[in-house]
């Protein structure tokens, strides 16, 4: 009774399609994909900035010696 079979998953998927419709699910999938893509891009941009700072590429005003 507690097992999840392929038949149960197909029934749930059919109910979801009937409830929301294919257009709504397609839109939801596109929005989710865009959100994941944006998140990955932000993470890559942050990593690139951290690597740039770690390599010593600092602005000139931070490298000058003040007495």
UniProtKB/Swiss-Prot annotation:
Membrane topology according to the record: Single-pass membrane protein
Region (Disordered) location: 45-67
Protein location: Cell inner membrane
Domain of life: Bacteria
Keyword presence, Ribosomal protein: no
Alphabetical GO biological process terms: protein transport by the Tat complex
Keywords on record: Cell inner membrane, Cell membrane, Membrane, Protein transport, Translocation, Transmembrane, Transmembrane helix, Transport
MF terms in GO: protein transmembrane transporter activity
Transmembrane segments: 1-21
Gene3D superfamilies per UniProt: 1.20.5.3310
UniProt xrefs under InterPro entries: TatA/B/E, TatA/E, TatE
Pfam families xref list: TatA_B_E
A single Gene Ontology CC term: TAT protein transport complex
HAMAP family linked: TatA_E, TatE
NCBIfam families registered for this protein in UniProt: PRK01614.1 (NF002448), PRK03625.1 (NF002960), tatAE (TIGR01411)
Family: Belongs to the TatA/E family. TatE subfamily.
Role according to the record: Part of the twin-arginine translocation (Tat) system that transports large folded proteins containing a characteristic twin-arginine motif in their signal peptide across membranes. TatE shares overlapping functions with TatA.
Protein name according to UniProt: Probable Sec-independent protein translocase protein TatE
């Amino acid at each position: 009774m507690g097992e999840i079979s392929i038949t149960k998953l197909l029934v749930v998927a059919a109910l979801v399609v009937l409830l929301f419709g294919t257009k709504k699910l397609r839109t939801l999938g596109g929005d989710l994909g865009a959100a994941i893509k944006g998140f990955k891009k932000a993470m890559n941009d942050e990593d690139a900035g951290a690597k740039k700072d770690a390599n010593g590429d600092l602005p000139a005003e931070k490298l000058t010696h003040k007495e």
